[in-house]
């Protein structure tokens, strides 16, 4: 019997990244939402929103709420669009599926996944896992030795939340996964309130404000200094940007606006010389302009200080340090040396540099800090899944078939994919051995092997602490490594 094609769906709360394994090396990306325009009185499903000419007052209906898929009626409509000839043109009955699910997915929601996929869409087989479980297969942590690290920290920065996920030997250590209630949605809403209070009323302009946040936002490396800089005159200020809002007129093709002046301003060829981006030039007095000063970095700062808006949670650096402190002492050096960033929010400018700097104050002097950033963190789960599904053993090992489901029900999926809170996924990237508890003591022979490979730092060495930064191309999909070296010698 011929092996069916494998459809990969990274089913995020904000966007879907999907494609056929071995065919679509880059995913098709479409919004995971149904949008309704108040002016055009039309409904747009998924990528159809690209045809909307007036994004003012767009109302969204999303399948996800607080990070969980709770509206399968809406999700089914979006997936139907995804499978249609206009997008992927696939027949589910002739296809195997790999789909990502939320961290700590509730059992009743997980069962609904099984029912919809096998009973509604009738896929031949499918496998379900959290995004971080796929990352060991990708090239994010790839080294010159070609040996994947056995202990890593994955920071998944998504639409609803940010998760800090420890992974050992290809398995998520579920009892130590931590969540910060700061994601892309919160940052967009925070920016909406700042702009509406200080400048224009944009409470109903979610789509436009989200574009403003993505274009202008950055993580401050000097919070107090940047605040003082923003007080200078706008025309001579190195931080303040002029962001021209879209007018949604018939002659305008700029749907989300553009940066007219300041850092990252649109170049003249993109603005037709001095006017609107690819649109009809307007007199400056007719344009609605946002002055983006401290609004650029006030939102991303919440990742490091959630308490600024009343969240009783520690920031991202402290959460990472706490998670690593719960690991066996013999392995903490490897966790510190392999911290990876994935998810759409990982694209924020200066994130890796700020995280590295803040972690230096929390990391013991004998360990190294390694921050790994993908060039496209939003698509890393998808590209990692392509590597997994390309393996010879994938089809015979991971998916549950439709026949097996109707014979044993969702109980088989629970056993094979893992249940709520369990160390669930038997994913064994090359070089890993699964089934080892992260709390197991490490033998002397294994530690000596790790020292020899440079995967672990010895404690008690003498030497002055020094800092060294380097960036190298890592992996098939362009990971970037920034490393800070601890002790100068043993």
From Swiss-Prot:
What the entry lists under SMART domains is as follows: ACTIN
Region of interest: Disordered = 260-285, 456-490
BP-aspect Gene Ontology terms: chromatin remodeling
The record's section on CDD domains has: ASKHA_NBD_Arp6 (cd10210)
Cross-referenced Gene3D superfamilies? 3.30.420.40, Actin, Chain A, domain 2, Actin, Chain A, domain 4
> Is Ribosomal protein included in the keywords of this UniProt record?
no
One molecular function GO term is:
nucleosome binding
Q: Which domain of life is it from?
A: Eukaryota
Q: Which InterPro entries match?
A: Actin, ATPase_NBD
The record's subcellular locations are: Cytoplasm; Cytoplasm, Cytoskeleton; Nucleus
Write the record's keywords in alphabetical order, separated by commas. Answer: Activator, Chromatin regulator, Cytoplasm, Cytoskeleton, Nucleus, Transcription, Transcription regulation
Please give the Pfam families that the UniProt record associates with this protein. Actin (PF00022)
GO CC annotations on file: cytoplasm; cytoskeleton; Swr1 complex
Functionally, this protein is described as follows: Component of the SWR1 complex which mediates the ATP-dependent exchange of histone H2A for the H2A variant HZT1 leading to transcriptional regulation of selected genes by chromatin remodeling. Involved in chromosome stability.
Q: How does it assemble?
A: Component of the SWR1 chromatin remodeling complex.
According to its UniProt record, which protein family does this protein belong to?
Answer: Belongs to the actin family. ARP6 subfamily.
What is this protein's record name? Actin-like protein ARP6
Q: What is the lineage of its organism?
A: Eukaryota, Fungi, Dikarya, Basidiomycota, Agaricomycotina
């Amino acid at each position: 019997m011929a092996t069916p094609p494998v459809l990969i769906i990274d089913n995020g709360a904000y966007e879907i990244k999907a494609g056929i394994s071995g065919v679509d090396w880059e995913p098709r990306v479409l919004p995971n939402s149904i949008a309704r325009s108040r002016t055009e009185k039309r409904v747009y499903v998924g990528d159809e929103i690209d045809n909307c000419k007036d994004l003012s007052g767009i109302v969204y209906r999303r399948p996800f709420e607080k990070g969980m898929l709770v509206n399968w009626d809406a999700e089914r409509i979006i997936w139907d669009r995804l499978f249609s000839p206009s997008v992927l043109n696939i027949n589910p009955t002739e296809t195997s599926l790999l789909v990502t699910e939320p961290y700590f997915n509730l059992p009743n929601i997980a069962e609904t996944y099984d029912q919809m996929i096998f009973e509604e869409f009738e896929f031949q087989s499918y496998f379900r896992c959290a995004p971080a479980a796929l990352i060991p297969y990708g090239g994010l942590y790839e080294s010159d030795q070609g040996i994947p690290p056995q202990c890593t920290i994955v920071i998944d920065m998504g639409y609803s939340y940010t998760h800090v996920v420890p992974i050992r030997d290809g398995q998520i250590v579920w009892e130590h996964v931590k969540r910060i209630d700061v994601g892309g949605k919160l940052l967009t809403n925070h920016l909406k309130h700042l702009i509406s209070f200080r400048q224009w009323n944009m409470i109903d302009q979610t789509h436009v404000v989200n574009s403003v946040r993505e274009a202008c936002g950055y993580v401050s490396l000097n919070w107090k200094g940047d605040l003082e800089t923003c007080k200078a005159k706008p025309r001579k200020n190195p931080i303040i940007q002029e962001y021209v809002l879209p007018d949604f007129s018939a002659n305008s093709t700029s749907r989300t606006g553009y940066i007219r002046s300041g850092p990252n301003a649109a170049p003249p060829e993109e603005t037709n010389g001095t006017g609107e981006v690819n649109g009809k030039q307007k007199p400056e007095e007719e344009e609605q302009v946002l002055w983006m000063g401290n609004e650029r970095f006030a939102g991303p700062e919440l990742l490091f200080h959630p308490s600024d808006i009343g969240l009783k949670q520690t920031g991202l650096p402290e959460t990472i340090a706490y998670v690593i402190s719960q690991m066996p002492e013999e392995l903490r050096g490897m966790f510190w040396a392999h911290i990876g960033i994935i998810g759409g929010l990982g694209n924020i400018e200066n994130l890796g540099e700020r995280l590295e700097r803040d972690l230096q104050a929390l990391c013991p002097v004998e360990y190294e800090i390694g921050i790994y950033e993908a060039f496209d963190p939003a698509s890393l789960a998808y590209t990692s899944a392509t590597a997994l599904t390309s393996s010879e053993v994938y089809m015979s090992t991971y998916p549950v078939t439709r026949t097996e489901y109707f014979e044993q029900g969702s109980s088989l999926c629970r056993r094979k994919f893992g249940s709520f809170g369990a160390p669930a996924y038997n994913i064994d990237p090359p070089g890993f051995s699964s089934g080892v508890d992260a709390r197991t003591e490490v033998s002397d022979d294994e530690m000596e092997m790790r020292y020899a490979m440079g995967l672990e730092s010895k404690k008690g060495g003498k030497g002055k602490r020094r800092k060294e930064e380097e960036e190298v191309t890592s992996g098939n999909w362009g990971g970037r490594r920034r490393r800070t070296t601890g002790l100068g010698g043993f």
